[in-house]
Every structure is written in C-alpha cells, then in structure tokens.
Amino acid sequence: MNSYGISEIAVIALRKSPDERSEMVSQILFGETFEILETIDRWCYIKLTFDLYEGWIDSKSITPLSENQYNEINAGTQAFTKRLFSELIKNGKENVIVPFGSTIPTYNNDGQLFKIHQNSYTFNKNSFIENLDPKDLLLQW
C-alpha cells in the first residue's frame, strides 16, 4: 500500500541521504504533496508530486495523507503564494509564515479557509493567485 504526505511546515529540507548533515538537494514548501517510497529509522524517502524530485526527509515533518486525501488534494483547485512571505492562521490562533510559491491545497475562492488533515487555515486572499503554474508565477515577479 502506498503512503502519502503533505508539508504543513514552511520549508522542509530534501536531502540526498538519510542524515541531517547530508547535502540538501531541494526544498519542500508548505502545501506540497509527496509519495513516501521507503522508510529507514526516522527518515522517509519521498517523491514530490509536482516536480518528481526524490530525496530524504525527517519523518517528524510529515503530515500523513490517505490515498483518497492525496488524490482529492491533487485533483482540486490550488492556489500559490505570490508574496515573498505570506501569513496563514492555523486553527484560529497560530500564525504560520509561508514563502513565495507555497501551495494552498483545496483552494476555494468563495472563502478564505482550507483544511489539511485536522487543521484549518485562514488567509488573506490578496496574498495568493489561483490556477497558475508556479513557474509562470516566477515570471510575473
């Protein structure tokens, strides 16, 4: 059975080997989804959904998703942050700062609320742009 996850952390280091001192080959931004391919101790070898990069991340940084949740998130409308840093409010009380290009999964332009797993997030709609490839977003910047 396949395992899936999503990042609820602003930036996660994607490493070449399962070690904190290992070279960082890429970064996972808030809202990015991935498939978990292998687990060794506290490390998971993952493949990113968007760009298919592969590497190791600390298992503590993973919010697990069921296959249905994973498919629903990736089939739905997504928005991306368009400011250098944008603020989200987690569960009505915790500020979360996310960088440019972060994904807002299951974006609903009727409101300013989305959920990841059991957490609810609110945001300022002016901080995001919907239905745009992140590569095109860079060109607008």
Where in this protein do the model-derived segments appear?
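Boundary regions of SH3-family modules and the immediately adjacent low-complexity/disordered segments
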Residues: 1-3, 9, 19, 26, ...
